[in-house]
């Protein structure tokens, strides 16, 4: 992967998604995507290694063909499972006037990772809240400033269970690619919020296949995150049981006729389903179906409210932002709006080819990767002269200004620590050919970004640090 291309992998419970993108002015230009449905993932974690590996491999291949990029290095998304979020600080001293650069920022953040003393967990992301130069000058990005005495950082930290981390990376790297870094969904969700939402206090609700993830942001920063083992699969199970039909039929009916808000569902939209205990077919209306869907989605939202209460979060002045595959259901916004007084919106990525809520996590991982690289001066992006339309990019300006950092990159210096069903994203042949043509044009017009040393495989470094 050339430095100006970013490849993200989102291993979800229903499918694996890969996006190839690049920084493009104030947004991300999506060059190619891949999606493969799989039964090898349960609750966001590896359930069957071989099945999951094949799905990941197939998805990478699809994205490579669509983008024309030979994918060798990737950024991996991690779920909010087995995750802890907390605050920490660290300070480094200077003994002469020093111009602060990316290596100094990396060093002060590295010290935070080393402070982790919770067994069986590993710090994966550190996101600076503020930097303090010479004990009194608070800044968001200290690069190029002169420090006479010290650089301090006050930061949020995301740690995850080591077993989850190791198995996810191992499965991806078994596909012949290197994991350059990992980013928690708790961290990634910041890029789908507006500056106002993050400042006032916003709750992201990502309703996936097996897991619903919750993250709360306030005053511009991640406050806490958690997950609920209730999501889209439970909705389908309820439909199958309520309509006395198979799970597969219930899934199709959910996507074709599903509505999460009973009051808005139609009693004129009629469909038939086969019964599991007879050869008969029975007719139902969308309103009949909505009765089952609304009850389960409502229960999911009540579980979210319980999570917020358990975290001590009682005000959501910035509103609720719902995303994930199950956010595709009609009526989700109306139902939640009926349950709360705060603003509610459904988040869908803006780029062509990924305009579905289930791609929010994958594109957000690229946003995190760009913010991380620019904070540490790993790359210097030379922008295209070409003009882009608003629909082709997603704004990452807020993410850049936050100066967040993903911390798993620090593993490369860590040593001696003791301790099959597939389906491609819909795209026409014309879009694929156009992507390949665009790739050739990018290669001609792009100036290469600054080179950095070839990194050894994250998984190999991690295994060395854990078992040597």
UniProtKB/Swiss-Prot annotation:
SMART domains to which the protein is assigned, alphabetical: FtsA (SM00842)
Subcellular location: Cell membrane
UniProt entry tagged with the keyword Signal: no
Gene3D superfamilies cross-referenced by the UniProt entry: 3.30.1490.110, 3.30.420.40
Compositionally biased region (Acidic residues): 425-434
Membrane topology designation: Peripheral membrane protein
Biased composition (Basic and acidic residues): 436-459
UniProtKB keywords: Cell cycle, Cell division, Cell membrane, Membrane
Chief localisation class: membrane
GO BP term (any one): FtsZ-dependent cytokinesis
Keyword Cell division: yes
GO cellular component: cell division site; cytoplasmic side of plasma membrane
Region called Disordered, residue ranges: 416-468
InterPro entries linked to this entry: ATPase_NBD, Cell_div_FtsA, FtsA/MreB, SHS2_FtsA
Function: Cell division protein that is involved in the assembly of the Z ring. May serve as a membrane anchor for the Z ring.
Subunit structure: Self-interacts. Interacts with FtsZ.
Family per record: Belongs to the FtsA/MreB family.
Protein name per Swiss-Prot or TrEMBL: Cell division protein FtsA
């Amino acid at each position: 992967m050339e430095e100006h291309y970013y490849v993200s992998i989102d291993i979800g419970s229903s499918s694996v998604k890969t996006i190839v993108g690049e920084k493009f002015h104030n947004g991300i230009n999506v060059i190619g995507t891949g999606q493969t449905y799989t039964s090898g993932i349960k609750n966001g974690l590896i359930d069957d290694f071989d099945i999951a590996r094949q799905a990941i491999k197939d998805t990478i291949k699809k994205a490579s063909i669509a983008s024309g990029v030979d994918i060798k290095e990737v950024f991996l998304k991690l779920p909010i499972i087995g995750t802890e979020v907390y605050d920490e600080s660290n300070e480094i001293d200077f003994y002469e006037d020093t111009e602060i650069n990316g290596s100094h920022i990396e060093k002060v953040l590295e010290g935070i990772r080393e402070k982790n003393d919770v067994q069986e967990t590993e710090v994966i992301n550190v996101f600076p809240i503020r930097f303090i130069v010479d004990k009194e000058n608070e800044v968001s990005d200290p690069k190029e400033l002169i420090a006479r005495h010290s650089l301090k950082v006050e930061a949020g930290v995301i740690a995850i269970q080591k077993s989850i981390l190791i198995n996810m990376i191992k499965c991806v790297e078994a596909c012949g690619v290197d994991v350059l870094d990992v980013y928690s969904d708790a961290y990634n969700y910041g890029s789908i919020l507006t500056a106002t939402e993050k400042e006032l206090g916003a709750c992201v609700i990502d309703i996936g296949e097996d897991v619903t993830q919750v993250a709360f942001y306030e005053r511009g920063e991640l406050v806490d995150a958690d997950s609920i083992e209730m999501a889209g699969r439970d909705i389908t199970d309820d439909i199958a049981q309520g309509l006395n039909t198979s799970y597969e039929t219930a899934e199709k009916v959910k996507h074709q006729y599903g509505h999460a808000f009973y009051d808005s569902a139609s009693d004129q939209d009629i469909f038939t389903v086969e019964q599991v205990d007879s050869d008969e077919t029975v007719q139902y209306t969308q309103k009949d179906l909505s009765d089952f869907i609304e009850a389960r989605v409502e229960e999911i939202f009540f579980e979210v409210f319980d999570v917020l209460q358990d975290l001590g979060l009682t005000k959501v002045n910035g509103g609720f932002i719902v995303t994930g595959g199950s956010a595709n259901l009609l009526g989700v916004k109306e139902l939640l709006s009926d349950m709360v007084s705060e603003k509610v919106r459904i988040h869908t990525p803006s780029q062509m080819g990924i305009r579905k809520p289930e791609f929010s996590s994958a594109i957000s991982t690229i946003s995190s990767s760009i913010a991380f690289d620019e904070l540490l001066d790993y790359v210097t992006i030379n922008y295209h002269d070409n003009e882009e339309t608003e629909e082709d990019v997603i704004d990452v300006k807020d993410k850049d200004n936050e100066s967040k950092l993903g911390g798993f990159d620090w593993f490369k210096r860590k040593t001696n620590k003791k301790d099959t069903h597939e389906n491609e994203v819909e795209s026409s042949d014309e879009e694929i050919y156009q992507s390949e043509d665009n790739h050739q044009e990018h290669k001609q017009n792009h100036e290469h970004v600054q080179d950095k040393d070839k990194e050894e495989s994250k998984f190999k470094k991690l295994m060395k640090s854990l078992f040597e």
